[in-house]
């Protein structure tokens, strides 16, 4: 991607991309990380006896144990999507028309420590959180989301400290990437409503992203910023003619 002066390496929610990644722990006992242990943790969720800190530690270390395999799968899916995904190929072409270049050298798979599935920096490209993807479709949605961010940064004069600008970016990325389509919300988020489901999903995701940004006080404040720019940003489907999916 083209560089911009002093542009911080930021994720969509304002977090540092470097801070999202993690190194593999030096000592891990692979015997502990087996199907029986995983089943016990899942069973504890059903019985109401969860130990959340223990669960997080367990799954984080299990991811680290399998980091090479997880990142290789992410790399393979990235290469496949760059070649065969209609939405990814379209956005890649549109970014190129604006002088940018997204490819396997600047779309990088890494292990991440937080709940996000990806991040974008105009200077460094796209970060894909390999250990956060449920499947290739989830990775496709994330790539499309970050590629919309890339297009917006090249097309518009985006101010990193302007909360209205950032809210607009999140509204557009969630609307156009496909991550808020009904089938995904129905099967992964248990969102059963059909009427205005897309709008509610986009508002929810944009608000959550804004809550993590410096200068945003709380959920109410984040929602107010999203509402201020909602109409124009939700209806702006560029570079698509309409919402693709």
From Swiss-Prot:
Database matches in InterPro entries: Peptidase_M76_ATP23
Active site as annotated: 146
Location within or outside the cell: Mitochondrion inner membrane
Any one GO MF annotation of this record: metal ion binding
Membrane topology: Peripheral membrane protein
An example Gene Ontology biological process: mitochondrial protein processing
Main location: mitochondrion
Keywords linked to the UniProt accession: Hydrolase, Membrane, Metal-binding, Metalloprotease, Mitochondrion, Mitochondrion inner membrane, Protease
Binding annotation for a divalent metal cation: 145, 149
Top-level taxon: Eukaryota
Signal peptide: none
GO cellular component, one term: mitochondrial inner membrane
Annotated Pfam families: Peptidase_M76 (PF09768)
EC number: 3.4.24.-
Similarity-based family: Belongs to the peptidase M76 family.
Function: Has a dual role in the assembly of mitochondrial ATPase. Acts as a protease that removes N-terminal residues of mitochondrial ATPase CF(0) subunit 6 at the intermembrane space side. Also involved in the correct assembly of the membrane-embedded ATPase CF(0) particle, probably mediating association of subunit 6 with the subunit 9 ring.
UniProt protein name: Mitochondrial inner membrane protease ATP23
Natural source organism: Phaeosphaeria nodorum (strain SN15 / ATCC MYA-4574 / FGSC 10173) (Glume blotch fungus)
């Amino acid at each position: 991607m083209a560089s911009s002066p002093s542009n911080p390496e930021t994720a969509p929610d304002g977090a540092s991309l470097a801070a999202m990644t993690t190194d593999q722990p030096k000592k891990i006992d692979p015997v502990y990380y087996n199907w029986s242990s995983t089943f016990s943790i899942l069973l504890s969720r059903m019985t109401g006896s969860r130990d959340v800190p223990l669960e997080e530690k367990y799954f984080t270390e299990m991811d680290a144990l399998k980091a090479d395999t997880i990142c290789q799968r992410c790399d393979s899916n990235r290469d496949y999507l760059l070649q065969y995904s209609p939405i990814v190929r379209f956005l890649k072409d549109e970014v190129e028309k604006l002088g940018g270049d997204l490819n396997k050298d600047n779309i990088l798979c890494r292990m991440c420590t937080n709940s996000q599935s990806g991040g974008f920096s105009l200077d460094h490209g796209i970060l894909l959180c390999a250990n956060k993807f449920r499947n290739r479709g989830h990775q496709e949605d994330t790539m499309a989301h970050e590629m919309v961010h890339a297009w917006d940064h090249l097309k518009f004069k985006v101010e990193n400290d302007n909360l209205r600008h950032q809210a607009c970016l999140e509204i557009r990325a969630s609307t156009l990437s496909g991550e808020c389509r009904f089938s995904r919300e129905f099967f992964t988020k248990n969102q059963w409503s059909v009427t205005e489901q897309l709008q509610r999903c986009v508002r929810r995701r944009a608000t959550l992203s804004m809550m993590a940004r410096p200068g945003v006080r709380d959920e109410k404040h984040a929602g107010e910023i999203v509402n201020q720019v909602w109409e124009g940003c939700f209806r702006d489907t560029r570079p698509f003619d309409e919402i693709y999916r």
